[in-house]
Amino acid sequence: MRTFFRNDVAPGVATGIRWDGTTNEGKPARNGVYSFTISAQGSAVAARRATAATPATLSFSLYGYAFPILGAHEFDLGAGRFGAPRAGHTHQGQDTMAACGTPLVAARGGTVQYAGYEAAAGNYIVIDGKGTPDDFMYAHMAEPSPLQTGETVRTGQPIGVVGDTGDAEGCHLHFEMWGPPGWYQGGSPFDPLPYLEKWDKYS
């Protein structure tokens, strides 16, 4: 449970509260359905009890991850699979086909570790997952990401669009997940498909 108090509300003025997905103790909240209650306190409210007998309650779903492609897509289960043989090495990510220009969002919020262009990856960005030991890499974007190294990113925040830059055959997202200590910092890539399939079900 998380409680917020606002003392600056006024009639006819829109007021917002942003929840960062943590509990009152500062720990990440679990995935699931949450409800929020709007209530008022004070003597001026007592006179309104007859018309507002119960607080307004709404619900929403909270998930710590988001599927990175906002549009029609198809997993490449052939040469685009993690571990598929390549010239002298194996494929280190999962390719997901989507039309060029399809929006991409951060699967997990965090801090941008790298953002740039590389001959094989094309336009790419690497984000370290806040509250996780993992790094998330997105490659072949049509244009450079609008985000810069060191910027903070929210889960689900736009990071670019699908493209075919670099060594890419057709429009798709090449997505990698790396364990600690991170992407090309001594960590190792692992198969992201089970995670992508899970996120795809609720995103």
Name every feature range the model reports, one short phrase each.
Residues 24, 43, 115, 178-182:
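Short coil/turn motifs at secondary-structure junctions
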Residues 35, 39, 44-45, 52-123, ...:
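Surface-exposed, glycine-biased beta-strand/turn segments
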